């Protein structure tokens, strides 16, 4: 295919995005398609839109899952979003590697992610960033970018970090608190928090046991002195 074909009618005037778009406020069951969608594709000409549409047609179910119901539990939203981005991002990379020349890669990466963004509330750049975090297993950054305001576990983590200096002081620990905060912030599973918070307690208990096992020297000295004082009387 010629380079002019790959540019997808780049010389054509891009269709402007309408300011108020009722059909973009959609649920998972109402996704705009065809001409209704291309009218709102800013920066995508009709030819470019058709190429993106045909190439991503096999992944329609993943495109739909980019716009999930608001009442869906957060755990499922994160799971479905990651799965969709992994599938779509991998498919886009295959297109770039096998069908594009070096100087065309940047253009078509931008166009394909822009097409994907039509099915999501997020912009193309945000979706690309989320895909990057998913691909490199940067879970913390992925969660921060996907749901910066919707994370109750973040407030819980913040409260734990505030309590950490007081806990260390109460247990008589004077270690590296900033290092402990860093470890706590990296934790994902709730069970791990309990393990970390119980470690100082166990060390405290072992300290107490060792103190109880120390010999009581003062009592032995008093007993010996008493025996010496009583010994002359017994001899007389």
Curated annotation (Swiss-Prot):
It comes from the Eukaryota. The keyword Kinase does not apply. One of its GO terms (cellular component) is cytoplasm. Residues 44-145 are annotated as: CHD1 helical C-terminal domain (CHCT). It is found in: Cytoplasm; Nucleus. Residues 214-226 have a biased composition (Basic residues). It holds the Pfam family CHD1-like_C. SMART domains: DUF4208. Keywords: Cytoplasm, Nucleus. Residues 198-212, 227-236 have a biased composition (Basic and acidic residues). Exclusively expressed in testes. Its main location: cytoplasm. Residues 1-29, 197-236 are annotated as: Disordered. The CHD1 helical C-terminal domain (CHCT) may bind DNA and nucleosomes. May play a role in regulation of apoptosis. This is CHD1 helical C-terminal domain containing protein 1. It comes from Mus musculus (Mouse). The gene is Chct1.
């Amino acid at each position: 295919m010629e380079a002019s074909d790959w540019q997808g009618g780049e010389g054509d005037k891009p269709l402007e995005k309408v300011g108020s778009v009722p059909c973009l406020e959609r649920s998972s069951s109402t996704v705009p398609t065809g001409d209704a969608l291309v009218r709102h594709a800013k920066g995508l000409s009709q030819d470019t839109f058709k190429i993106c549409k045909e190439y991503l047609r096999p992944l329609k179910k993943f495109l739909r899952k980019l716009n999930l119901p608001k009442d869906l539990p957060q755990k499922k939203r994160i799971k479905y979003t990651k799965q969709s981005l992994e599938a779509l991002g991998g498919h886009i990379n295959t297109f770039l590697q096998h069908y594009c020349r070096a100087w065309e890669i940047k253009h078509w990466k931008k166009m394909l992610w822009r097409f994907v963004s039509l099915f999501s509330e997020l912009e193309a750049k945000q979706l690309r960033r989320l895909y990057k975090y998913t691909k490199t297993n940067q879970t913390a950054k992925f969660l921060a970018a996907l749901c910066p305001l919707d994370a109750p576990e973040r407030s819980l983590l913040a409260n734990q970090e505030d309590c950490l200096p007081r806990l260390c002081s109460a247990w008589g620990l004077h270690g590296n608190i900033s290092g402990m905060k860093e470890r706590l912030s990296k934790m994902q599973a709730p069970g791990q928090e309990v393990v970390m918070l119980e470690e100082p307690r166990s060390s405290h208990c072992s300290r107490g046991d060792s103190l109880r096992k120390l010999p009581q020297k003062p009592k032995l000295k008093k007993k010996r002195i008493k025996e010496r004082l009583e010994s002359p009387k017994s001899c007389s």
